[in-house]
Amino acid sequence: MKTTVYLIRHSVRINTKNLIESWKTSQDKIVKSEKIILSVTGEKRAEILSNEEELQNIDVVYTSNCVRTLQTAKYLLEKQHLKANIDERFDEKRVGKPNDKEYPDWYTRQYEDENFKTEGGESQAEVRERVNEAFQEVVGQNKGKRIAIFTHDYAIMYFLLKWCKLEKVTPNREIKLSFKGKVVFDKRINSPEVFKLTLNDGNEIEEIENIPFDDLEFDDFNK
């Protein structure tokens, strides 16, 4: 019996630089990470996503601890009468201190060096370890089911690098991945973005696919 897992990046979030004038809160770090919400466009795109034929008949849903993933999932949850399982191990990478000046090549470097990180941040390897830990638990508890995991850009891409080969990464955030010699992704990651993983009876990944949707053209908060 095969298990199907959909790794789903959240929809378009707000651009805080454009919409927030000031921060008067003791929780600024949390507000800037976990509590970031979807944009108006992001809400519309999340609802469109919930109606895609590929994502019907889901058995179980997991989300990260961040508001924007739950906001993306809520349309699918309501439509299919499901409840979310929140797991912080699916959270986005902790970026750490701003690094553009000290590491102008930080975007490509974080993909090419799995141990690269800035002060207070996480490395590719660290993110992959926690995401994989959660993933293995999820598939172990839901064998043979159709699983949707709503998570984040880096969390997904770093996790996929456990099985995929990084063919290319560019400063303008274009990424090319291959699985078993076949290119499975070659573009910028969309908001939302969906990857379909098919696992065999032994919970080994047999196939990785990127699922495009014609009614969800590229959009992102930092496009």
Locate each region found by the language model.
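Acidic, low-complexity terminal tails and accessory targeting/binding regions
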Residues: 1-3, 52, 85-86, 92-104, ...
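Beta-strand elements within well-structured catalytic alpha/beta cores of enzymes
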Residues: 4-8, 62, 142-151, 155
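Glycine-rich phosphate-binding loop signature in dinucleotide/nucleotide-binding domains
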Residues: 54-57, 138-145
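Phosphate-handling substructures
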Residues: 14-18, 28-37, 77-133, 173-174, ...
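Active-site-proximal alpha-helix that buttresses catalytic centers in soluble enzyme cores
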Residues: 2-82
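Short, conserved alpha-helical segments within structured domains
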Residues: 65-69, 89, 151-155
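Short active-site segment of divalent metal-dependent hydrolases/proteases
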Residues: 13, 155-156
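Active-site signature of alpha/beta-hydrolase-fold catalytic machinery across serine-
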Residues: 75, 158-162
